[in-house]
């Protein structure tokens, strides 16, 4: 009988030792969990803190970036305002210079036309020729004088060809040999003061070269009706045929 009792006691001891080891292992697991919980809590707190640190630093950097952007925008706006003001001043100065040039040009043109009117045959005092009328009349006047001199030299033989071509009252108007006493007097002024220089205006005489091109008038009289000019000379001379 003693042998079975010993075996039972040994079995009980083994079982108790096994249960103690199980309890010890269970206790150790609980202790491990209890130990791990504070560690996890501390690590969880540290991780958000670490994550929140960049957000705080980024939040601190955002106002600085906004300030820089605002400063850049302000600078751009100032540059635009300055450039617009500069462009406005440049345009104004260019406009003023252009107006001055145009004013000077018109003054010079009017002075030249006045000088041209002074050498043309005289009109009544109340007559005022426009610019285009002055130019046409000067063209016709020069053309008539040139044709008269050319026909006098080529068409009629003899030394007194010009005197026979022009009327007697216009003979003193012809230019003579230059003399030192008459250097200050021009032939144009003498022609303007003489009665032979009363030439019709291109507007009043539609058969003039320039008026025939610009106006649709019918055929009129001769261009310059000199009293001593032969009537058939204007019709037989080739240079006068286009102006009939």
UniProtKB/Swiss-Prot annotation:
Gene Ontology cellular component annotations, sorted alphabetically: neuronal cell body; nucleus; perikaryon
Function: Acts as a transcriptional regulator. Involved in the initiation of neuronal differentiation. Activates transcription by binding to the E box (5'-CANNTG-3'). Associates with chromatin to enhancer regulatory elements in genes encoding key transcriptional regulators of neurogenesis.
Main location: nucleus
Origin species: Rattus norvegicus
GO biological process: auditory behavior; axon development; cell fate commitment; cochlea development; cochlea morphogenesis; craniofacial suture morphogenesis; exit from mitosis; forebrain development
Coiled coil feature spans: none
Keyword Transcription regulation: yes
Subunit structure of this chain's protein: Efficient DNA binding requires dimerization with another bHLH protein.
Name of the protein this chain belongs to: Neurogenin-1
Residues annotated as domain bHLH: 93-145
Pfam families on file: HLH (PF00010)
Record SMART domains: HLH (SM00353)
UniProt-recorded Gene Ontology molecular function terms: chromatin binding; DNA binding; DNA-binding transcription factor activity, RNA polymerase II-specific; E-box binding; protein homodimerization activity; sequence-specific double-stranded DNA binding
Gene from which the chain derives: Neurog1
Known tissue expression: Expression restricted to the embryonic nervous system.
Gene3D superfamilies, per the entry: Helix-loop-helix DNA-binding domain
């Amino acid at each position: 009988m003693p042998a079975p009792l010993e075996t039972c006691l040994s079995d009980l001891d083994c079982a108790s030792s096994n249960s103690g080891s199980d309890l010890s292992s269970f206790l150790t697991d609980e202790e491990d969990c209890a130990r791990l919980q504070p560690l996890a809590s501390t690590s969880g707190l540290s991780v958000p803190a670490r994550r929140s640190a960049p957000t705080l630093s980024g939040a601190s950097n955002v106002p600085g970036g906004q300030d820089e952007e605002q400063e850049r925008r302000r600078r751009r706006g100032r540059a635009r305002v300055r450039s617009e003001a500069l462009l406005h001043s440049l345009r104004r100065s260019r406009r003023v210079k252009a107006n001055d040039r145009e004013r000077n040009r018109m003054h010079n043109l009017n002075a030249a036309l006045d000088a041209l009117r002074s050498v043309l045959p005289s009109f009544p005092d109340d007559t005022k020729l426009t610019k285009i009328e002055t130019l046409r009349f000067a063209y016709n006047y020069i053309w008539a004088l040139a044709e008269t001199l050319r026909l006098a030299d080529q068409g009629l033989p003899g030394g007194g060809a010009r005197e026979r071509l022009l009327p007697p009252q216009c003979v003193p108007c012809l230019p003579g040999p230059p003399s030192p006493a008459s250097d200050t007097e021009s032939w144009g002024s003498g022609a303007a003061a003489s009665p032979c220089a009363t030439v019709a205006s291109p507007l009043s005489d539609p058969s003039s070269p320039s008026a025939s091109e610009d106006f649709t008038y019918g055929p009129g009289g001769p261009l310059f009706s000199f009293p001593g000019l032969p009537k058939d000379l204007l019709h037989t001379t080739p240079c006068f045929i286009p102006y009939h």
